[in-house]
């Protein structure tokens, strides 16, 4: 085996790391000492086992692979240490050559032979004979002839990817996977206009004139065009340097499957396509307000987005990703530049780059070439960049970076900044909040929330209520955490923010501080339970109450919110919905139960343990 360790498939590395991680500490250190002779570096990698979700064997192999270690060296070391089970995992994998010829003929297969040339010639002849409007593109089954060979069987496919979709003529708005997508129904209509000829596309874009080009990407260029007085956006696909033959066709099939099978209010719909001999193109509606990236930094003389509009856009993004994940579809290209805004500033998630189903059904993820996504590295987790394992976690992490961009006003990547990536700036704040013994039991999410609220919240868009800041930052931390990241939990956090800000649309932003409570510099009488102990679901519940539009999200227990009975803590949620009480009885004695600080901290940790955000060792540890 002459290949390097970093060329091993992800499923092989997963099985190998799980096997070696189960070794005793003595056996593992013996294996690692042959790989790393520097004891300082070895101890650094060994200390990573305390971090949740980190495989120290994978970190060790990653360090070794960066030194050009080969698979043969790894197998020899495993056999020398008599770790035959781990060696068998590597030996059971055999690189599959791209050519179907026997192994001795592999050197000849490097050059294009007569067989490959004849196949290409046959394919060109078929393209010439093919009619201008092929009937296979008008069926509701496979989108192209090659798509039938790639898509999974009907038993394995999700409901939205199956061919037989129920007709629902009465439904005028498609947002779930139970009804037939609108674009998919259009394919079966006689005389539909979904298929565009090359002449139509050339005429609409004036032969892809440079003055019509909107943006330039890795896989395609976007042009603006017009047909019958209607503006369209044309995505002209192109071959990527170093890609395999036919990659453009596979990319076209994948994006068409995703757009046609997923009909959602926050996913950019497909209006047409063109599969000609000169170029391949996808046609979408033209988004008048550009992308979220442009509006965040006021590019193109656009106005600054206010907080209510920002919350609505982020909620729409999370709804789109949650819908795709419910269909087992991974977008893998979530970033602010791909969140397009229509004339009403409604978000539309666009430009997916992944296949609508995993290529490897055994491991349930797709191995992708990371060098094709270097431009999007600012939105990708470090684990994906290293290993190449594409899961739903990648989309959720990218959503967290977009939410952080909107909240902080800091670009995801800035070459003139240190660190360059916003994700490194946020994650670097976590160790600063883990210095004391008590804070070691605090989850990573709370540390991120505190740092974001104190240092990085955007000020140019106006004042944001403190409770909204915490809920928004909580949504960011939920997406960025390595274990149990949940797009649904982040959406619930933002739902409360959106509901609260929507009720304040009639108020000038200069008066928001008056409507949301006293200033942080004003002395305030409080009890021993601070606002940080309140959970995010309580924010959502209070924001949905009728009186929450004009009252603070978190009702205080001090002079501004005096108590008139001994059941104040039990009825705190109802007080938030009914509004503040009159201060006429503020001098009366307030009977309240004082909770021991250690007991309160234990109760909070038990809640985190039930949510699987805290290990038992951290719950009952020192």
Curated annotation (Swiss-Prot):
Record-linked PROSITE patterns = PROTEIN_KINASE_DOM
Q: Does the keyword ATP-binding apply?
A: yes
Q: List the disulfide bonds.
A: none
Q: Which domain of life is it from?
A: Eukaryota
Listed A to Z, the keywords are:
ATP-binding, Nucleotide-binding
**What residues does ATP bind to?**
214-222, 235, 335-338
For whether the record's keyword set contains Nuclease, the answer is no
Q: Which GO terms describe its molecular function?
A: ATP binding; protein heterodimerization activity; protein homodimerization activity; protein kinase activity; signaling adaptor activity
Domain Death: where?
Answer: 13-94
Tissue specificity:
Ubiquitously expressed, with a higher expression observed in brain, spleen and liver. Isoform 1 and isoform 2 are considered agonist and isoform 3 and isoform 4 are considered antagonist.
Region Disordered: start-end pairs: 511-532, 553-591
- Record note on quaternary structure: Interacts with MYD88. IL-1 stimulation leads to the formation of a signaling complex which dissociates from the IL-1 receptor following the binding of PELI1.
Q: Which family does it belong to?
A: Belongs to the protein kinase superfamily. TKL Ser/Thr protein kinase family. Pelle subfamily.
Function noted in UniProt: Binds to the IL-1 type I receptor following IL-1 engagement, triggering intracellular signaling cascades leading to transcriptional up-regulation and mRNA stabilization.
Protein's UniProt name? Interleukin-1 receptor-associated kinase-like 2
The organism is: Mus musculus (Mouse)
Encoding gene per record: Irak2
């Amino acid at each position: 085996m002459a290949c390097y360790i970093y060329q091993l498939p992800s499923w092989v590395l997963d099985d190998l790391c799980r096997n070696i991680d189960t070794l005793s500490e003595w056996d593992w250190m013996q294996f690692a000492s042959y790989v790393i002779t520097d004891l300082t570096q070895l101890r650094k990698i060994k200390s990573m086992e305390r971090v949740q979700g980190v495989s120290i064997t994978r970190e060790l192999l990653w360090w070794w692979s960066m030194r050009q270690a080969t698979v043969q060296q790894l197998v020899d070391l495993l056999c020398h240490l008599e770790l035959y089970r781990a060696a068998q995992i590597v030996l059971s994998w055999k690189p599959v050559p791209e050519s179907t010829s026997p192994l001795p003929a592999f050197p000849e297969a490097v050059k294009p032979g007569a067989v490959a040339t004849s196949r290409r010639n046959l394919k060109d002849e078929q393209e010439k004979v093919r009619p201008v409007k092929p009937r296979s593109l008008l069926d509701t089954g496979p989108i192209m002839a090659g798509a039938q060979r790639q898509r999974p069987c009907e038993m394995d496919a999700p409901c939205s990817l199956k061919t037989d979709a129920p007709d629902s003529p009465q439904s005028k708005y498609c947002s779930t996977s139970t009804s037939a997508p609108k674009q998919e129904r259009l394919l079966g209509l006689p005389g539909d206009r979904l298929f565009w000829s090359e002449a139509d596309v050339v005429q609409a874009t004036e032969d892809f004139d440079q003055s019509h080009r909107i943006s330039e990407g890795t896989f395609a260029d976007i042009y603006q065009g017009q047909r019958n007085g209607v503006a369209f956006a044309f995505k002209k696909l192109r071959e990527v340097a170093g890609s395999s033959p036919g990659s453009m066709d596979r990319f076209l099939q994948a994006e068409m499957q995703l757009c046609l099978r997923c009909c959602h209010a926050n996913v950019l719909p497909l209006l047409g396509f063109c599969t000609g001999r000169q170029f391949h193109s996808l046609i979408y509606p033209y988004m008048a307000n550009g992308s979220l990236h442009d509006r965040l930094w006021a590019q193109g003389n656009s106005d600054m987005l206010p907080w209510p509009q920002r919350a609505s856009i982020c909620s729409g993004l999370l709804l789109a990703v949650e819908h795709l994940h419910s269909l087992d579809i991974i977008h893998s290209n979530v970033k602010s530049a791909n969140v397009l805004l229509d004339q009403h500033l409604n978000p539309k998630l666009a430009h997916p780059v992944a296949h609508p189903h995993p290529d490897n059904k055994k491991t349930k993820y797709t191995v992708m070439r990371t060098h094709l996504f270097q431009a999007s590295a600012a939105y990708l987790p470090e684990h994906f960049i290293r290993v190449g394992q594409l899961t739903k976690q990648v989309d959720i992490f990218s959503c967290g970076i977009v939410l952080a961009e909107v909240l902080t006003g800091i670009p995801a990547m800035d070459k003139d900044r240190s660190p360059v990536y916003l994700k490194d700036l946020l994650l670097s704040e976590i160790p600063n909040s883990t210095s004391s013994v008590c804070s070691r039991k605090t989850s990573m999410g709370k540390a991120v929330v505190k740092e974001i609220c104190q240092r990085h919240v955007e000020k140019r868009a106006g004042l944001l209520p403190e409770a909204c800041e915490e809920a928004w930052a909580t949504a960011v931390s939920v997406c960025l955490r390595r274990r149990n990241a949940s797009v649904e939990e982040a959406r619930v956090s933002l739902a409360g923010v959106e509901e609260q800000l929507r009720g304040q649309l009639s108020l000038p932003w200069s008066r928001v501080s008056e409507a949301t409570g006293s200033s942080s510099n004003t002395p305030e009488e409080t009890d021993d339970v601070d606002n940080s102990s309140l959970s995010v679901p309580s924010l959502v519940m209070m924001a949905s109450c009728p009186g929450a539009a004009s009252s603070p999200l978190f009702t205080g227990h001090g002079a501004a919110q005096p108590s008139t009975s001994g059941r104040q803590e039990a009825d705190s949620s109802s007080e938030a919905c009914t509004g503040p009480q009159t201060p006429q009885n503020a001098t009366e004695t307030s009977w309240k139960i004082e909770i021991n600080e250690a007991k309160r901290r234990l109760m909070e940790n038990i809640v985190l343990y039930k949510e699987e955000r805290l290990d038992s060792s951290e719950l009952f540890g020192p």
